[in-house]
């Protein structure tokens, strides 16, 4: 090989190495930014809804999915930085699904050096026995799992139960209840458990599913698929998820507005007579902040600006 070719090859190798170094730097930067964003969003949700207080013992429900892994990881980070003291115990419910790799979670949790508990309960057989083939198992599975987790929380002395539901889950539940249950009802970030003994929290309430997916890849979490319910096709939740994904693609910002609307509810402008005292409403002679003036200030009512995805009415409609 001539000296010129050798010089060219060396220069090319140096250029490739420099590009590779820059790419790696960018990846590290983006991954660090993702971690900071998740910590900020989880911390904000905890603060906004007073999810965790000094002296709490938080039972983190770990399913082996990307979301619960992310939840545990971020809570462990925040615990080190928080101005308050709280304990974490990770709990997995082994439902005895066929081919469930029951060695993965114990091995992972031992590496973290945190308290954990594996609860063995054969809910899989119960669900398969009671639910006809082809029918959705989610509802019964959820009820059985919930009851077991409440009992385990009692046994472990945990007063808070942390679940890995994220922002997308909350919006999907909102539309599921609206479309199929005729209710304006979502998935609250904090609520009292059915038995009245615990507070259930969802610290990922502000976190997008896309971020937990990416974070799982970055952290290389040992994901365990759910063969009981996750593999079922044509679930209503999947239809809603597809609808929201399509909206986000066609009309950027719409899904963000929907999520924001869940925190800016005006009961006087809905139709729930239990939520607002329509029957007792009287004219007081004083202007009301949420009166008809609210309709005059709608941002979408100015000029002829069209709303993406909405067909405007003709004058004679």
UniProtKB/Swiss-Prot annotation:
Described purpose of this protein according to its UniProt entry: Catalyzes the ATP-dependent 2-thiolation of cytidine in position 32 of tRNA, to form 2-thiocytidine (s(2)C32). The sulfur atoms are provided by the cysteine/cysteine desulfurase (IscS) system.
PP-loop motif (motif): residue ranges: 63-68
Q: Which pathway is recorded for this entry?
A: tRNA modification
What protein name is recorded for this chain? tRNA-cytidine(32) 2-sulfurtransferase
> What organism, scientifically named, is this protein from?
Janthinobacterium sp. (strain Marseille)
Q: Which UniProt keywords apply?
A: 4Fe-4S, ATP-binding, Cytoplasm, Iron, Iron-sulfur, Magnesium, Metal-binding, Nucleotide-binding, RNA-binding, Transferase, tRNA processing, tRNA-binding
Single GO molecular-function term? 4 iron, 4 sulfur cluster binding
Q: Name one Pfam family in it.
A: ATP_bind_3
Which co-factors does it depend on? Mg(2+); [4Fe-4S] cluster
């Amino acid at each position: 090989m001539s000296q010129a070719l050798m010089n060219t090859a060396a220069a090319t190798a140096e250029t490739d190495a420099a590009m590779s170094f820059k790419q790696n730097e960018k990846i590290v930067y983006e991954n660090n930014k993702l971690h900071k964003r998740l910590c900020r969003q989880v911390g904000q949700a905890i603060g906004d809804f007073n999810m965790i207080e000094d002296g709490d013992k938080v039972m983190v429900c770990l399913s082996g999915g990307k979301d619960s892994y992310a939840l545990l990881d971020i809570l462990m980070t925040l615990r080190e930085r928080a101005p308050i003291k709280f304990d974490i115990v990770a709990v997995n419910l082994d439902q005895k699904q066929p081919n469930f790799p029951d060695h993965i979670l114990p091995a992972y949790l031992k590496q973290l050096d945190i308290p954990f508990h594996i609860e063995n309960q054969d809910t899989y057989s119960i669900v398969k026995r009671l639910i006809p083939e082809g029918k959705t198992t989610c509802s019964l599975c959820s009820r059985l799992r919930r009851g077991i987790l409440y009992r385990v929380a009692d046994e472990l002395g945990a007063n808070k139960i942390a679940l890995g539901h994220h922002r997308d889950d909350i919006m999907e539940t909102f539309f599921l209840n609206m479309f199929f249950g005729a209710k304006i009802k979502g998935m609250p970030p904090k609520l009292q458990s059915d038995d009245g003994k615990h507070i259930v929290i969802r610290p990922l309430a502000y976190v997008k599913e896309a971020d937990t997916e990416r974070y799982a890849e970055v952290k290389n979490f040992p994901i365990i698929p759910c063969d009981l319910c996750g593999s079922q096709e044509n679930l209503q939740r999947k239809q809603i998820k597809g609808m929201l994904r399509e909206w986000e693609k066609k009309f950027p910002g719409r899904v963000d507005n929907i999520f924001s609307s869940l925190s800016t509810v005006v009961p006087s402008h809905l139709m729930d007579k239990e939520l607002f005292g329509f029957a007792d409403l009287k004219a007081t002679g004083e202007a009301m902040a949420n009166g008809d003036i609210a309709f005059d200030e709608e941002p979408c009512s100015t000029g002829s600006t069209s709303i993406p995805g909405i067909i405007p009415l003709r004058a004679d409609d």
